[in-house]
From Swiss-Prot:
This is NAD kinase. Keywords: ATP-binding, Cytoplasm, Kinase, NAD, NADP, Nucleotide-binding, Transferase. Belongs to the NAD kinase family. One of its GO terms (molecular function) is metal ion binding. It comes from Escherichia coli (strain SMS-3-5 / SECEC). NCBIfam families: PRK01231.1, PRK03378.1. It is found in: Cytoplasm. One of its GO terms (cellular component) is cytoplasm.
Length: 292
């Protein structure tokens, strides 16, 4: 066993038998190689593992050197928002659909992971967004996002009127179905579907992408990631929401603003040694191949 990683966490929310099979294979393989392994509690319960060290996501973040997330991008997003708070590296085995964030092929995961455990990997720091719903002199409601923060109506679709301030300076007003505020990581997700630009992961930038704006002049805007975005609302409705990674919703009440900024911590995401971002784009998005 090498000294690059000593304690490995196994993470994920198994939804079908193939994912559970991968979890079990990974656990037994790591134990056989002599690593200390800590398994997320739900996985250990589903696999009926006995005499195994288990923990919550937060405990895995505190104790492990590396977390292996088995599942799709949704599993990775859910785990990464918690794990990003800790000094832990994260890699994913794809058991979902696209797999932009989960690089390892489940059929070749052992060999790829063996190389990673020997220290042969590519490391990236992916920043998160922090969203606050706040009113003057009131307690804030806060969440974070790896991909995007989305302003949208609650249960019934309708037009929203709002103003956007960047670093407390008025930028524009808009009537639309909402607004997507995306990180470079999220630029290939919901933002892409809404016509937003693709940003390479190392860019220190945030995109603001309108959702069905009621004007032909509204276009996506790219700003520095050090900027703070404030959303203000002109209506008296109280059915608006902010969604983080399409997994966490924060309701917006009358008189409240939304403040979005770059988070203080980041995700330590690692990839196999042969990883290429542009090859991932070509494969996942069906781009044409090289001509010569």
């Amino acid at each position: 066993m090498n000294n690059h990683f000593k304690c490995i966490g196994i993470v994920g929310h198994p939804r079908h038998p193939t994912a559970l099979t991968t979890h079990e294979m990974l656990y037994r393989w790591l134990c056989a190689k002599g690593y200390e392994v800590i398994v997320e509690q739900q996985i250990a319960h589903e696999l009926q593992l006995k005499n195994v060290k288990t923990g919550t996501l937060a405990e895995i973040g505190q104790l492990a050197d590396l977390a292996v997330v088995v599942g799709g991008d949704g599993n990775m997003l859910g785990a990464a928002r918690t794990l990003a708070r800790y000094d832990i590296k994260v890699i994913g085995i794809n058991r979902g659909n696209l797999g932009f964030l989960t690089d390892l092929d489940p059929d070749n995961a052992q060999q790829q992971l063996a190389d990673v455990l020997e220290g042969h990997y590519i490391s990236e720091k992916r920043f998160l967004l922090e969203a606050q719903v706040c009113q003057q002199d009131c307690q804030k409601r806060i969440s974070t996002a790896i991909n995007e923060v989305v302003l949208h109506p609650g249960k019934v679709a309708h037009m929203i009127e709002f103003e956007v301030y960047i670093d407390e300076i008025f930028a524009f007003s808009q009537r639309s179905d909402g607004l997507i505020i995306s990180t470079p990581t999220g630029s290939t997700a919901y933002s892409l579907s809404a016509g937003g630009p693709i940003l390479t992961p190392s860019l220190d930038a945030i995109t603001l992408v309108p959702m069905f704006p009621h004007t032909l002049s509204a276009r996506p805007l790219v700003i520095n990631s050090s900027s703070t975005i404030r959303l203000r609302f002109s209506h008296r409705r109280n059915d608006l929401e902010i969604s983080c990674d399409s997994q966490i919703a924060l309701p917006i009440q009358e008189g409240e603003d939304v403040l979005i900024r770059r988070c203080d911590y980041h995700l330590n995401l690692i990839h196999p040694k042969d990883y290429s971002y542009f090859n991932t784009l070509s494969t996942k998005l069906g781009w044409s191949k090289k001509l010569f």
